[in-house]
């Protein structure tokens, strides 16, 4: 078996091919390729030249911005097992080996050795419709951030002594433009869901859960690839960075916070959904109030509710049954401090 480590850059990527059967894992073939369709084809030919067949080669690369996507999709289409790992995992692995120095070639070797040692799970590309939805959801998030910023500026300008009318008008026009873009993005999102019966079904199931509106449900489905690779609430909570991270050393008292090692967009939208769920007349609100009655701070209770909401959302989508309040037990779950 071979393991290919790829250090991704915006213009090119460096590769290191290891024979996983070699216990020393030293040596190996190295090269560099343009991060372009032509470069991806050259990489495939290079792998064939070195006897690295698709059925017996694991490709490992870091999730570096969007630059990894072209190479990963190309190799996946050719039948290679591709693992896309968090750069932090590679960084900590490199530290554990007391690696000195840092170059692109050295990074590719570290990634290959990580793959040979850890054997990370293969990556599964999102279906095309979900990729488009994720792109729209993230663009909407960016527009909302700009809109919030411009509304704040307009508020300040209107309270300023003798604000310039030209500046005020320009800010008002920008706000109007951004509001129009927001409406266009939401129409496009609804159109994407309407075009896919399975995604529309999942959306309706998720919005049956108190706290999940259209945008929150769309974000959760986009950021989890429709729950395709998640089998349990524990996995989902960890992926969102909402799982407990205990801290205890020697005689120091132990305490727990959420790990925050995960998808920040998913964590943020789950928290916002939890805030909405506290205003509903449901068992989820009762769950939150029960934690408050037990002395938990509001934020701790909200984090616990956010985690529970994701777990309930996963359950309704996997089961194909809408939310049933009878399955919510206010007494369950022990929250972790945020």
Task: Describe each PLM feature range.
Residues 1-338:
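A detector of single, family-specific signature residues
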């Amino acid at each position: 078996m071979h393991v290919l480590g790829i250090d991704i850059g915006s213009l090119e990527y460096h590769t290191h091919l290891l024979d996983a059967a070699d216990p020393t894992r030293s040596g190996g073939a190295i090269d560099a390729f343009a991060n372009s369709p032509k470069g991806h084809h050259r990489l495939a030919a290079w792998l064939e030249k070195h006897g690295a067949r698709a059925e017996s080669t694991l490709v490992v690369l870091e999730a570096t911005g969007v630059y990894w996507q072209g190479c990963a999709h190309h190799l996946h289409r050719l039948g290679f097992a591709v693992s896309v790992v968090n750069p932090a995992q590679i960084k900590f692995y490199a530290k554990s080996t007391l690696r000195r120095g840092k170059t692109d070639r050295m990074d590719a070797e570290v990634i290959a050795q990580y793959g040979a040692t850890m054997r990370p799970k293969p990556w599964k590309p999102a279906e095309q419709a979900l990729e488009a939805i994720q792109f729209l959801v993230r663009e909407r998030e960016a527009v909302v951030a700009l809109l919030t910023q411009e509304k704040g500026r307009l508020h300040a300008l209107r309270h300023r002594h003798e604000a310039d009318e030209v500046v005020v008008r320009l800010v008002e026009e920008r706000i109007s433009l951004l509001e129009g873009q927001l409406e266009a993005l939401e129409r496009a999102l609804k159109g994407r869901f309407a075009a896919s019966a399975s995604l529309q079904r999942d959306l309706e199931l998720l919005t049956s859960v108190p706290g999940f509106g259209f945008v929150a449900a769309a974000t959760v489905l986009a950021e989890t690839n429709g729950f395709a690779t998640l089998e349990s609430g524990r996995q989902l909570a960890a992926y969102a960075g909402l799982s407990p991270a205990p801290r205890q050393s020697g005689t120091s008292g132990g305490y727990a916070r959420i790990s925050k090692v995960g998808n920040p967009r998913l964590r943020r939208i789950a928290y916002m959904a939890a805030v909405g769920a506290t205003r509903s007349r449901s068992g989820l609100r009762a769950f939150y109030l029960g934690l408050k009655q037990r002395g938990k701070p509001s934020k701790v209770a909200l984090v616990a509710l956010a985690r529970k909401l994701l777990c309930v959302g996963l359950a309704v989508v996997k089961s194909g049954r809408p939310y049933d309040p009878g399955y919510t037990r206010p007494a369950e779950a022990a929250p972790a401090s945020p």
